[in-house]
Every structure is written in C-alpha cells, then in structure tokens.
C-alpha cells in the first residue's frame, strides 16, 4: 500500500500481491507437509477418489450455486445505484459501505472461526449440546450486531462529516437500509454454519430465488425511489430467504424439531435490542452535550460513551432474559480461569 501511495503505480502493488500470494502458498504447503506428513495430494488419484466419495462433487455443485448467488447479492448494488441515480451517488454510497463492510468483515472473520467447531459438534451427534451451542453463537451474534448497528447509526454521519465534509452525508433512510442489510448479514452466520455442518446445500432454489428477488425488487423499486429502492432489493430477498426460509430448512432437515421455539427466542432478542436502543438513547442524550462532528477527539469520546452505554444495557438485558448469553458467559469464564 505504501508503494502504491508513493509511486502512484498500482502495477507495483499488483505484482507484490501476486508474488506474496505465491510465496505464501509455498510456505503453507511446506508447513502442511511438516505438520501432516500423512496428508498427501495426488491429481492422478482424483477420478478414483471421486468414485469412492461421490457426495463430494454433489455438495460442491450445490455449494457453488449458493456462492454464486451470494456474489450476485453483494456485488450488484453499486451498479444498480449508478443505474438509478448518478456516479456521485455511487461515491457517496461507497463511503458508507466502505465503513460498514470492513467492520462487518472483521466481525464475521472473528465469529466465523467457529465454523469448524460446529461441524465437529454436529458429527458427534449430541443433540442437547448442538442446540445449546447454537443458541450461544446466535446470542453473541445478536449482541454484537446490536452494538454494531447502534454505534454506526449514531457515529457514521459525524465521522463522514469529519473525514469528507457534511455535504457527503446521505439521507437517514439510506443509512437505515444499509444497517438493516448489515444486521441480517451478521446475524445469519450461525444458521449458515449449522447448515454447512449438516451438509444441507440441496435447497439450490433458495439462493437462485434470493438473487432473482434481489435484482427484480431493486430494479422495480429503484426506478421509483432511487437508492432507497435499490437497497430494498437485498433487504426483502434476505428477509424472505435468509431470515425465514433458512431457519425453517435447518429445523426441518437438521434439528428435526419445531420452529416455534426459534421464533419465540428470536422475538425476545429483537425486543431486547429495541429496549436497549431506546434506554441508551434516552440516557446519553440527557448526559452528553458534546458535538462529535467538531473534532476527532470529541468523536472518539462520543463513540466510547455511546457504545459503552448501549453495550452494558444490552448485555444486562440479554443476560437476564436469554439462556444463550448466560451459557456463553459461563463458557468464557471457564476458559479464562483455565
């Protein structure tokens, strides 16, 4: 990045990225050979192994469809924003998504590391433990997602005002839609991990329908309401497929239990997030008088105060009213004591 910045030649940056990619692959392969000498790959054995494990190709094809649909969902919005507004609006929109996407990626990378553990847990077949860990992971995702959207709702506009200027701030409705989509993307992780753990990829109609709904709704609504209409596409499609269908699919084919308990606990999470949001807003508006858009120091102070107030209230409410966050807390305390 420093080379690209000072030389203004991105070919250098691409060359370095490519070279380090090859170097990393070589070092990684050598480390794998040292750590797992029994794990060897041979292209010549490919056809034989495919015959022995036919499910591998079947699952790969199904997973490929899911990944393509996810790509369509995540990459089409900027083009549609440009189609129904202007290049200037795309730049403004990109400023927001640059912040939300990077933070979402960081959170998902941290929480996504539990995926392999979920697969092992499912393989063990302990139904009670499977459900307990499911709600632990779900509760921590909703807790973190609540902090994420609350913080960005109050902090992203003053930050952009400091960073670029107040004329780069977009309508509040656009911010709400961006955060709603980000919230779904963060909270969907546990369902996806368990679907992968059970090997449930055969609902290939779902990602195709999700992509089709996203494009059609974004195009239709975008022609009427511009950027807000475009953002309605992923919001509606993810609500129908990710929030409604995928839990039904997991509970029916994976857990093989009633879905009513899921909706009941989930409604409790939403009620807690809403209550924590209202209480936090009332508290910090009554005690905070600083303007976060006046300087970076005041913005950092404002961010620490508002985020801390919400985090404390949200954790207390979730700890009191949900079993998942209590189990997760006990697990973390045990690990720390060890």
Where are these regions (language model features)?
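Interfacial/gating helices of multi-pass transporter permease domains
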Residues: 10-15, 51-59, 79-101, 129-132, ...
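Helix-terminus/linker motif at the lipid-water interface of multi-pass membrane proteins
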Residues: 2-7, 71-102, 120-121, 157-167, ...
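Membrane-proximal transmembrane or re-entrant/amphipathic helices at the cytosolic face
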Residues: 257-258, 281-338
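Helix-loop junctions and terminal segments of transmembrane helices
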Residues: 36-41, 96, 100-138, 142, ...
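Short runs within selected transmembrane alpha-helices of multi-pass transporters and secretion channels
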Residues: 1, 13-29, 66, 70, ...
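Interhelical loop/hinge segments that connect adjacent transmembrane helices in multipass membrane
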Residues: 10-13, 28-74, 117-132, 249-267
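Short helix-kink/termination motifs in transmembrane helices of multi-pass secondary transporters
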Residues: 60, 64, 68-80, 84, ...
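Alpha-helical transmembrane segments of multi-pass membrane transport and lipid-handling proteins
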Residues: 131-185, 215-224, 273-278, 282
């Amino acid at each position: 990045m420093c080379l690209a910045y000072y030389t203004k030649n991105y070919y250098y940056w691409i060359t370095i990225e490519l070279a380090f990619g090859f170097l990393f692959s070589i070092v990684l392969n050598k480390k794998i050979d040292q750590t797992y000498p029994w794990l060897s790959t041979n292209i010549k054995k490919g056809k034989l192994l495919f015959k022995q494990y036919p499910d591998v190709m079947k699952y790969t094809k199904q997973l490929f469809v899911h990944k393509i649909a996810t790509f369509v969902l995540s990459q089409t919005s900027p083009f549609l924003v440009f189609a129904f507004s202007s290049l200037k609006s795309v730049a403004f929109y990109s400023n927001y998504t640059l912040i939300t996407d990077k933070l979402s990626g960081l959170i998902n990378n941290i929480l996504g590391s539990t995926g392999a553990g979920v697969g092992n847990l499912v393989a063990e077949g302990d139904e009670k433990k499977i459900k307990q860990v499911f709600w632990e992971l779900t509760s921590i995702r909703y807790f973190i997602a609540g902090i994420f959207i609350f913080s960005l709702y109050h902090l992203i506009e003053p930050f952009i005002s400091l960073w670029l200027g107040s004329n780069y701030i977009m309508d509040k409705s656009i911010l709400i839609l961006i955060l709603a989509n980000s919230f779904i993307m963060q909270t969907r992780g546990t369902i996806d991990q368990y679907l992968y753990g059970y090997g449930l990829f055969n609902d290939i109609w779902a990602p195709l329908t999700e992509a089709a709904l996203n494009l059609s709704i974004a195009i239709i609504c975008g022609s009427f309401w511009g950027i807000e209409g475009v953002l309605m596409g992923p919001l509606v499609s993810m609500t129908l497929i990710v929030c409604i269908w995928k839990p039904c699919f997991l509970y029916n084919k994976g857990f093989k239990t009633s879905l009513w308990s899921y909706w009941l606990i989930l409604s409790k999470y939403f009620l807690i997030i809403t209550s924590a949001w209202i209480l936090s807003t009332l508290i910090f508006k009554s005690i905070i008088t600083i303007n976060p858009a006046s300087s970076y120091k005041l913005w950092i102070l404002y961010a620490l105060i508002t985020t801390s107030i919400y985090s404390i209230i949200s954790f207390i409410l979730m700890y009191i009213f949900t079993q998942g966050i209590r189990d997760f807390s006990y697990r973390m305390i045990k690990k720390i004591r060890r």
